């Protein structure tokens, strides 16, 4: 993921700050904000950032109610969060990501995806045991990319797979100009 100095990045479901810290380490000139609903986890993230002197802000909040102004981020990232959300909450969270992204901004999601082989279906079983069968079902059915496009994003691409192919890396772009028939966060 290419980022330019001065860009603003939001990490939805930042947890203990691992992804936010990695982004800041690789791109020290970007402004990184993490958001998570767990205060104890956010305390851990803040301690980790202070320990390495990384200027990262961690806010308390939810993916489906982002406390940020419209068009305030150049990138929105999320790692292993969406499979935890109910289908209707996924839709609202994606609309919120769309809302806070600037036109031309990018959404990057790493999350459980549809298995492509019998081996991948077996490999995902421990993941499902840990996170719950119900929590992962929607993503394993391949619905997340459809929801991303239905939200109004363009240029959706699966840019790779990790963890034995279980986790898909998705990138999509908020259009620079929205047409009247395109779904937005207000539809």
Predicted regions and their residues:
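Conserved alpha-helix/loop element of class I SAM-dependent methyltransferases that forms part
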Residues: 1-5
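Short glycine-centered segments of the SAM/dcSAM-binding site in methyltransferase folds
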Residues: 8, 104-106
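Class I SAM-dependent methyltransferase SAM/SAH-binding core
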Residues: 10-12, 16-65
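C-terminal alpha-helical "lid/dimerization" subdomain adjacent to the S-adenosyl-L-methionine
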Residues: 25, 108-151, 155-168
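A short acidic, Gly/Pro-enriched loop at the edge of an enzyme's catalytic core
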Residues: 64-75
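A short SAM/SAH-binding and catalytic strip from SAM-dependent methyltransferases
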Residues: 75-88
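A short glycine-rich, Lys/Arg-flanked "PGG" loop and its adjoining helix->strand segment in the class I
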Residues: 91-103
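C-terminal lobe and adjacent flexible extensions of AdoMet/dcAdoMet transferase-like proteins
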Residues: 169-187
